Amino acid sequence: YKQRLVDGEDIVCDLTGGLGADSYFLSLKVSRLIYVERNASYCDVAAYNMEQLGVRNIQILDDNAVALLIERPEKLSGVNVFYMDPARRGAGNRRVFALEDCEPDLNELWPLLCRSKCKVIAKLSPMLDIRRLLLQLPGIREVHVVSVRNDCKELLLVADLSCVPDDSKNDDVVP
């Protein structure tokens, strides 16, 4: 389903690579994909899997998404779409769903992404208040509610950050 949200000419950066499943399927549709993951062992698994699957358009980066956006943006040259699926497990492997409890915290990441003026696709918990998300994160153009057999599994936010003013801030209090 997520493949429908990207085009063949897109250069996508998956900022939360994990084991690489989403990166793999997105890579089948786009010209190039940059996979970013801070866990080196996950990077190794993803690299091995991509090689076994014959994927040649993925670059694996063992890095932290926030640090990469701030300190090494040149590694993201040409990227026009950012994808992320923030980890929704907290201490003791407990499920979390609030943006600020996920890793990375999308509230922290959003201002950095706004500077890119790119498209952003974020996979989030279906427990989130959509109205609040629209107020919290500027530039959201679409919200996809993904369900399987009438069971809501996830929300997919699609944002066009080229429309967000440079002085836009996320420090407003949201009800």
Question: Which residues fall in each region the model found?
Answer:
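S-adenosyl-L-methionine
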Residues: 1-10, 38-78
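Conserved SAM-binding loop of SAM-dependent methyltransferases across substrates and taxa
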Residues: 19-31
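Hydrophobic anchor at the start of a short beta-strand
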Residues: 33, 58, 120
